[in-house]
Amino acid sequence: MEFKHISVLLEETIDSLNIKEDGVYVDCTLGGGGHSKEILKKLSHKGKLIGIDQDTSAIKAAKEKLKDYENIIYVHNNFYNIDSILEELDIDKVDGIIMDLGVSSYQLDEASRGFSYMKDAPLDMRMNREENLSAYGVINNYEEEELFKILKNYGEEKFSRKIARFIVEKRTENPIETTGELVEIIRKAIPAKFQREGHPAKRTFQAIRIEVNKELQILNKAIEDSVNRLNKDGRLSIITFHSLEDRIVKVKFKELEKPCTCPPSFPICVCGKEPQIKIITKKPIEPSKEEKEINSRSRSAKLRVCRKI
């Protein structure tokens, strides 16, 4: 299956980077190469782009799309490791970093990846297929209390307790092996009147995907490491697709902009923690009405940008 992915907030993200033609940039989520291609267009032969992705299918597709460009380095890794990645490449500082945290259209559309609740497939959901933990492992091996907490905290699912109980009851009969089986369990757990607003499995699938790929833990560390690797005036641009991610980015940016931990009663700062960034987007940038109509998957996207000081 061809790797297809429509880059969300493409123009806005590229503009936010304030690209220098001889600069060094990092695309932490290479995907199909949409954002990377626009960055490369603006770079001179002295400029450089590092494209990171944990999905080998994404890297293969990006290499084909970007075959006319020689100043890109491909890295099969997780952007959680951005610090060690740059160290291995002997790159100290960079001028801009982007993260597009959405699941690609390809990953959603290829049934075998198990990300979609619309198609029956083996329970997988691994961004990196070389990792051991899959959705199957979470659903069939986690204790009921663990499942409840994951669905509640990562999916913000109202019926997390009931869904977790139904999953555990069902798997005592036989292992739950497919997305279709899981969807049916969720449908039975959620009262019919609450199934009218969107697909009933949406929040549960989001929660399991986040757990399998450790997405929220990765994001916190990656933001800190990315800021530390930026040159003065370098930009960090992050696109999120759900409230949990957006909240993490918002809070982390605020911490880095105003890190002082002194009590409000202190007349001057004595903790010595200095601001590292300036937030560019006081409110997140959202897709235009036109983009939302063209690409329905862009509807929940939010772009937040900061500048290293």
UniProtKB/Swiss-Prot annotation:
GO cellular component, one term: cytoplasm
Keywords: Cytoplasm, Methyltransferase, rRNA processing, S-adenosyl-L-methionine, Transferase
GO terms (BP aspect): rRNA base methylation
Subcellular location: Cytoplasm
Classification via Pfam families: Methyltransf_5 (PF01795)
Superkingdom in the source lineage: Bacteria
GO function terms (MF aspect): rRNA (cytosine-N4-)-methyltransferase activity
Main location: cytoplasm
The keyword Zinc belongs to this UniProt entry's keyword annotation: no
Protein EC: 2.1.1.199
Binding site for S-adenosyl-L-methionine: G33, G34, H35, D53, F79, D100, Q107
Catalytic activity of the protein: cytidine(1402) in 16S rRNA + S-adenosyl-L-methionine = N(4)-methylcytidine(1402) in 16S rRNA + S-adenosyl-L-homocysteine + H(+)
UniProt similarity note: Belongs to the methyltransferase superfamily. RsmH family.
PANTHER family: 12S RRNA N4-METHYLCYTIDINE METHYLTRANSFERASE (PTHR11265:SF0), S-ADENOSYL-METHYLTRANSFERASE MRAW (PTHR11265)
Classification via HAMAP family: 16SrRNA_methyltr_H
NCBIfam families, per the entry: 16S rRNA (cytosine(1402)-N(4))-methyltransferase RsmH (TIGR00006)
Function in brief: Specifically methylates the N4 position of cytidine in position 1402 (C1402) of 16S rRNA.
Protein name: Ribosomal RNA small subunit methyltransferase H
Gene: rsmH
